[in-house]
Amino acid sequence: MPIARRSLVVASAAAAALPAWAQPSAAEADAPALPRAGTPLPLAPIDRFDGSRFEPREADGRVLVLYWWASWCPFCALVSPHIEALWRQERGKGLLLLAPSIDREPQAARDYLTRRGYTFPAAWVTPEFQRALPKPRGLPVTIVRGRDGRVRQAEAGQLFPEDVMALARHLQ
């Protein structure tokens, strides 16, 4: 069998053997794409784990970092320490941060935050919040909303520590 044909057969067999779990869930496949820079980003109210309530008007005229995450997400585990560092370093300079968790149960997210000692403002995504502000495709998802209410930056997947810390440039 010629090499090109053999390679095609091997590649086809490998693709057919991919397990179902390697494919995105139906919900993830239907998730919206990341918003484009410059587009308006409407917000929705949500109860934070600390008992306070995030109201969209809090973000008026402020830079907001939205960080969707989950306790079971390995990439979130790599990014979250740097989100915490960003929060600690920049909150006094006007940074607003909201970290909605997509865990199935809010207690899993609360426990994770406690175990890791994270203090960044986090919440659990309720169906109402998801309808108003659907999580874009990917995880983690990090979106920076500028003072004017428009997307300044949107990223899906792991960010390097320097990329997370560079989000502070949007405060200038």
Label each region the model flagged.
Residues L43-L64:
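A short beta-strand-turn-helix
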Residues A44, W68-W69, Y112, F120:
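Conserved hydrophobic/aromatic "anchor" residues
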Residues Y112-R147:
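Short, internal strand/loop/helix patches
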Residues R62-L64, W69-W72, G138:
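Short pre-active-site segment immediately N-terminal to redox-active cysteine/selenocysteine motifs
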Residues A77-R116, T126-R131:
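Structural microenvironment flanking redox-active thiols in thiol-disulfide oxidoreductases
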Residues R147-Q172:
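Thiol-/selenol-based redox modules, centered on thioredoxin-like
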Residues A20-L43, D111:
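N-proximal helix/coil linker or "cap" segments that precede and/or mark the start of modular domains
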Residues P2, S7-Q23:
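N-terminal export signals
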